């Protein structure tokens, strides 16, 4: 009788199991997918079937066994694999009852061969497992083959189950308190140190010895801090007490060996306990002077600092001085104002100039021409040359007019008329060529004098930069005649010119 009762405790009652298996599945357990011909197929997922089997039979009330797996076909086409597998699985209960069935799994167009085998075999075993569990009753999926039941279960409404955070399996549930206390000695030295500190912080009252003749002290409960009870160990001989202290100290040093530990290995609780220990030490003396209340810290710009400090009560040590200049910075003028640099400062820096205009003339404004930097001596020399050459300009202008008229008369084969007859005599025909060459030389000389005057005035133009070919890195002439050959890809352009006369018939 005792053995039968133990069996009933270990295994579920057969009547309860049969009652659960006779019930049909609710809509929460049924899933649907699209089958062949756009028809919807009802099925139960593999993980739901395993959960139902654990709830009905118990976690140790049933077992599975894969009898055989057969690869039906393996095709490879264009680097993709298609596999079909057949699996035979047996599900056995604790009393020896079992169900055995077949399952099939197929994978198509899988690029990786191992992944194709994995998916095909797993799907075959899962299919066989669900078919085996279906043989035990409606609650494990047999009701899904009843079409009348499926037509009615679609009309049943249900609310999805809420997510329960309290029903989660956490790491704290993994080990019991008893087993955790037994394995604490095998932890790292930081845990040992924490355990030792907790033991030292609690006064040991087991070693207290009272005199038998004296009455036992009455136990009182109050909120006052407890004082350590004086034991008779302090009245022990000095020799024995010193030996015990040395032995305890050596044991503590073995446990608190910090030779192989770093600051990162210390736990947060341990650091807090060490800080509390240091603060509670009566031998340490700290300065308990009240700290100055500096108030809230506010970030403002340098311009707004002066106005902010005038309205708010800012301590003197925290005020911002906008006129503060570090000793490492050497300034020539005051930075608070905008003014010209004194000439005395420029002379100290080695700049020799009589006026600021002479200095600023070297730096032209945007969009203007930059004149040549010319000294004062050259300016005076150019001024004298301009005065001396004023008369020359008038003479050269008059002579150039006469020379141009003479050139035109020579080219046309006529004499000079008008006012030029009084100043220029008629030139014989055989000396016309020499006369023209002399006139052209004078004109070139006049043009060169004009260009020299323009250059002396300091006008500077940027020279023409030669164009460099990107492939040959050679300069391309600026005035290069374009070839008449048409480039590839461009339309043909006819040259503008006189049309050829059409041939007459």
Swiss-Prot record:
<dbReference type="GO" id="GO:0000730">
    <property type="term" value="P:DNA recombinase assembly"/>
</dbReference>
<dbReference type="GO" id="GO:0000709">
    <property type="term" value="P:meiotic joint molecule formation"/>
</dbReference>
<feature type="region of interest" description="Disordered">
    <location>
        <begin position="178"/>
        <end position="251"/>
    </location>
</feature>
<keyword id="KW-0539">Nucleus</keyword>
<dbReference type="InterPro" id="IPR041247">
    <property type="entry name" value="Rad52_fam"/>
</dbReference>
<dbReference type="GO" id="GO:0045002">
    <property type="term" value="P:double-strand break repair via single-strand annealing"/>
</dbReference>
<comment type="function">
    <text>Involved in DNA double-strand break (DSB) repair and recombination. Promotes the annealing of complementary single-stranded DNA and by stimulation of the RAD51 recombinase.</text>
</comment>
<dbReference type="GO" id="GO:0000228">
    <property type="term" value="C:nuclear chromosome"/>
</dbReference>
<keyword id="KW-0238">DNA-binding</keyword>
<dbReference type="GO" id="GO:0006277">
    <property type="term" value="P:DNA amplification"/>
</dbReference>
<feature type="compositionally biased region" description="Basic and acidic residues">
    <location>
        <begin position="378"/>
        <end position="404"/>
    </location>
</feature>
<dbReference type="GO" id="GO:0000727">
    <property type="term" value="P:double-strand break repair via break-induced replication"/>
</dbReference>
<feature type="compositionally biased region" description="Polar residues">
    <location>
        <begin position="448"/>
        <end position="457"/>
    </location>
</feature>
<feature type="region of interest" description="Disordered">
    <location>
        <begin position="368"/>
        <end position="505"/>
    </location>
</feature>
<dbReference type="GO" id="GO:0000150">
    <property type="term" value="F:DNA strand exchange activity"/>
</dbReference>
<comment type="subunit">
    <text>Part of a complex that includes RAD51, RAD52 and RAD59.</text>
</comment>
<dbReference type="GO" id="GO:0043504">
    <property type="term" value="P:mitochondrial DNA repair"/>
</dbReference>
<dbReference type="GO" id="GO:0005739">
    <property type="term" value="C:mitochondrion"/>
</dbReference>
<dbReference type="GO" id="GO:0006301">
    <property type="term" value="P:postreplication repair"/>
</dbReference>
<dbReference type="GO" id="GO:1990814">
    <property type="term" value="F:DNA/DNA annealing activity"/>
</dbReference>
<feature type="compositionally biased region" description="Polar residues">
    <location>
        <begin position="470"/>
        <end position="482"/>
    </location>
</feature>
<dbReference type="InterPro" id="IPR042525">
    <property type="entry name" value="Rad52_Rad59_Rad22_sf"/>
</dbReference>
<keyword id="KW-0234">DNA repair</keyword>
<keyword id="KW-0233">DNA recombination</keyword>
<dbReference type="InterPro" id="IPR004585">
    <property type="entry name" value="DNA_recomb/repair_Rad52"/>
</dbReference>
<feature type="DNA-binding region">
    <location>
        <begin position="130"/>
        <end position="134"/>
    </location>
</feature>
<protein>
    <recommendedName>
        <fullName>DNA repair and recombination protein RAD52</fullName>
    </recommendedName>
</protein>
<feature type="compositionally biased region" description="Polar residues">
    <location>
        <begin position="406"/>
        <end position="439"/>
    </location>
</feature>
<dbReference type="Pfam" id="PF04098">
    <property type="entry name" value="Rad52_Rad22"/>
</dbReference>
<dbReference type="GO" id="GO:0000722">
    <property type="term" value="P:telomere maintenance via recombination"/>
</dbReference>
<feature type="compositionally biased region" description="Basic and acidic residues">
    <location>
        <begin position="229"/>
        <end position="251"/>
    </location>
</feature>
<comment type="similarity">
    <text>Belongs to the RAD52 family.</text>
</comment>
<dbReference type="InterPro" id="IPR007232">
    <property type="entry name" value="Rad52_Rad59_Rad22"/>
</dbReference>
<keyword id="KW-0227">DNA damage</keyword>
